[in-house]
Curated annotation (Swiss-Prot):
InterPro entries with a match to the protein in the record: Uncharacterised_AF1718 (IPR020073)
Taxon lineage: Archaea, Methanobacteriati, Methanobacteriota, Archaeoglobi, Archaeoglobales
Pfam families: DUF5371
Name used for this protein in its record: Uncharacterized protein AF_1718
Organism: Archaeoglobus fulgidus (strain ATCC 49558 / DSM 4304 / JCM 9628 / NBRC 100126 / VC-16)
Length: 66
């Protein structure tokens, strides 16, 4: 049995320091690999609802504006 999966290209804007932290935490050098690993973890982890990324991004943006 062959399972067909539709693949889409997704894009986002991240502060540079968040991307660097993501690469460090995932152990990946390439942006696309770090994001893919993070998305996979997010979908599998039962604790992801506790610290939403949107809230962290808002805090980073507020700090940069100061």
């Amino acid at each position: 049995m062959v399972v067909m999966v539709k693949i889409v290209h997704a894009q986002t804007v991240l502060p540079e320091n968040v991307l660097e932290e993501l690469k460090r935490k995932t152990g990946e050098n390439a942006t696309k690999d770090a994001i893919a690993k993070a998305v996979e973890h997010y979908l599998m982890c039962p604790y992801t609802h506790e610290a939403p990324l949107e809230k962290r991004l808002e805090e980073v943006i507020k700090k940069k504006k100061k």
